[in-house]
Amino acid sequence: SLTNYDYRCIYDFYKKKIETKTTIDSQLDFLLQMYCHGSIEMTKSWVEKNMYLDIETLVNMLIESMPERLKQYINL
């Protein structure tokens, strides 16, 4: 499905960025998976339900929702 494809692309993108700075342990991988799934589901809801947010606000909220432990390895 498109959702699974998007998940894999986003997960792989962030995983590669993180791996340039550290080894991904199981806890960090859990946070990454949770963030990627959540981001995709919220974006999907935004499209399907015609949410009131403009795209810039949505992007900013997705960035803000990233766990601090991930942010330290990803330059946003």
Show the residue positions of the predicted features.
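Amphipathic alpha-helical packing segments from all-alpha helical-bundle domains
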Residues: 1-21, 26-41, 71
